[in-house]
Structure formats: C-alpha cells, structure tokens
Amino acid sequence: MYQFRKDVQFMCGFAGYYGAGDFNREEVIDQMGERIAHRGPDSKGSFVDDYVALGFRRLSIIDLEGGSQPIHSADGKHVIIFNGEIYNYQEIRKELIEKHGCQFQTNSDTEVILQGYKTYGEKIASMLRGMFAFVIYDKETHNLFGARDYFGIKPFYYAQMNGSLLFGSEIKSFLAHPHFHKEVNKDALKMYLIFQYTPLLETMFKGVFKLEPGTYFTYDGKELKKTKYFDPTYAKKDRSFDETVKLI
C-alpha cells in the first residue's frame, strides 16, 4: 500500500537470507534492512537464527500497535515477514477462530496469514485476497514458505548464490550480503533497451529473479520449489450481469 507523507512516497518492505557464512548474521540483516529504509519509516524488526535471517521495514496500514514484524506464532514455531494488505483477512480470521479455535495475539492481517498457514498449509496462498508478498519460516523443520499475490502487485525478488538464498522487496538489499555477486544480465539489458522494461522473470542483475505472480515457493535449504497457485482462464462464461458483478 502506498501512502504520502510530506510529499514522500513510502511502502513496507522486507529482506532476508537463508544460509551460513563467515560473517555477523545480525549485522548483515540490519544492513540489508537499511538499504530499504525508505520503504518503512514507522519501525523495523528482525529475526535471526543459525539458518535464517529476516528483516522488516514497516509502514503502518492496519493495526498500528499490534502489527510490528516479524510476527511469531503463539507456539513460537513459526515466524513471518509480510508486505502488503489482505482485504479479506477479517473473514479468514473469523473462520480460523470459529472453526479451528485459533487464538490471536494481534489484530493484524499479518498474523492471519501466519495462522492460516499453520491451519491450511500451502492452500492459504489461494485463499488470500489482496496484494501481498511474504515469507514464513518454520523454526523446527528450518523450511521456508513464501508467496506473491495473484497479479504481482507487490514485488518479490530472490537469488541463489554461494550456498545462500537471498530474498526481498528490492534487489538493493542484496548488495549488503557478502555472498551477493554483482554482474549485469546482458539478456535483460537487451530487453530493456528494446522495450524500456524487462518482461523476463530475470532482472538487470545476473542470477536475480522475480517470483512469478500467483506463485508460492518452498525451500528446505537445498532446493527451491515453485508452484503456480493461480492461472487466469479466459473461457467464456454464461453468467448474468449481476452474477459477474458479485464475483468481481
């Protein structure tokens, strides 16, 4: 979500990495967060263990007091960083409480995604309505799960380099990681010079990719698996005008 303050445009953002290295993990994630400080003027937060480091820069949209990130699950087994806004989070929250007995620590849409994942698993991505990019870390299995919204409104970049998986809202956060190697992607550069845009899933940096819209991923420390949870169909439907409006 965008918000104007004193003629400056801000939006939330996150950065993170998975993998070991001969460096100070807390210092690296803090520096990665500083690279995207312009995205979140309200607060910052981080989570670091021996496998993963997550950093967040926050612009308050919903739940000013209770939405600081990263957010941990009540049982302490999962942690999430999230950029975006979920329009139907109240409906999902109600279902989680009434049908599954879930308890919430905050009123934020972020925690709804986290509890939804713990309850429904990977299916939660297709249940969300809104614009979003997020990563959830399982502290017990040391696996990652993340997703990007249906139409790619919220950015999500990733790179696998020297045994590390880097991910975030902006590529510039990767520049603060010791394993990141800067190299121009000549194929993407050609596309940009032709179209003034890079239509590929690649970016101007070699080895850095966009997570496709309508896609979620899992990562176990070795293999990154991507799954398409949404693919628009254009088959003609025999619906009335009122039915179509309701679906929209």
Regions found by a protein language model. Give the residues of each.
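Low-complexity, intrinsically disordered or signal/transmembrane-proximal segments
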Residues: 2-3, 9
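Cysteine-centered catalytic environments shared across enzyme families
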Residues: 8-248
